[in-house]
Regions:
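Loop/turn residues immediately N-terminal
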Residues: 24-27, 83-84, 154-155
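Blade-edge motifs of beta-propeller repeat domains
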Residues: 1, 32-58, 91-129, 162-171
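Active-site lining segments that contact anionic ligands and/or coordinate catalytic metals
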Residues: 2, 15, 60, 73, ...
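Beta-propeller blade termini
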Residues: 2-11, 61-68, 122, 130-139
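Conserved blade-register residue in beta-propeller folds
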Residues: 28-30, 87-90, 158-160
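Hydrophobic beta-strand residues in large extracellular and virion-surface proteins
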Residues: 5, 18-20, 26, 76, ...
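Acidic/hydrophobic-patterned starts of short beta strands in beta-sheet-rich repeat architectures
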Residues: 12-21, 70-79, 141-150
């Protein structure tokens, strides 16, 4: 997989932001300035967005339909080939859904990104592909949605929800 780096006018000065293609989106890195040594400084990546865009969760998305945030509307929680776990909030109703753009689901405060590294049966070219396949269920019977995942790491993992019904927090 190869990404192309595209310079993009920042609109603030004569310096360029960068747009770089990734598995789940195109990302914009805003130019922030220079270090004292003269190296450029860029922001953390932010997805490039499109108005009224269709839902997009990356390649080989594995969706689950579940009321993730306890508001009564069915949301989508999905894994993708990159190894990310994504949440699409339903801002509408179950009969007329209106999904927000995806948010990364976190565990322990960090976005979930499960990849095998170089210990994968498919070989080193698959090291960065997690092929995350989540199943949302109440694993421990506490009334909160938990997540069981599998993928290219060739093992199952259970992520228990230690948050609340309205604000899930996986560990």
């Amino acid at each position: 997989y190869s990404s192309r780096v595209i310079p993009y006018p920042s609109g603030r000065n004569d310096r360029q932001d960068l747009i770089i293609g990734g598995e789940a989106a195109m990302y914009r890195y805003r130019f922030l300035g220079f270090t004292p040594e003269g190296a450029p400084i860029y922001s953390d990546p932010a997805p490039v967005l499109q108005r009224n865009a269709p839902l997009y969760g990356g390649s080989l998305t594995v969706p689950n339909v579940v009321d993730w945030d306890g508001d009564g509307a069915l949301d989508i929680v999905a894994g993708n080939s990159e190894g990310r776990l994504l949440f699409f909030k339903n801002r509408g109703t179950n009969t007329e859904p209106d999904f927000a753009r995806s948010e990364e689901v976190c565990a322990g405060g960090s976005p979930i990104l499960l990849r095998p590294g170089y210990h994968v049966v498919q070989g080193p070219f698959e090291a960065s592909w997690g092929y995350l396949c989540p199943t949302v269920c109440d694993w421990n019977g506490d009334g909160l949605p938990d997540v069981v995942v599998s993928g290219s790491r060739a093992k199952f993992e259970v992520m228990l929800n230690r948050g609340t019904r309205e604000k899930p927090e996986l560990d």
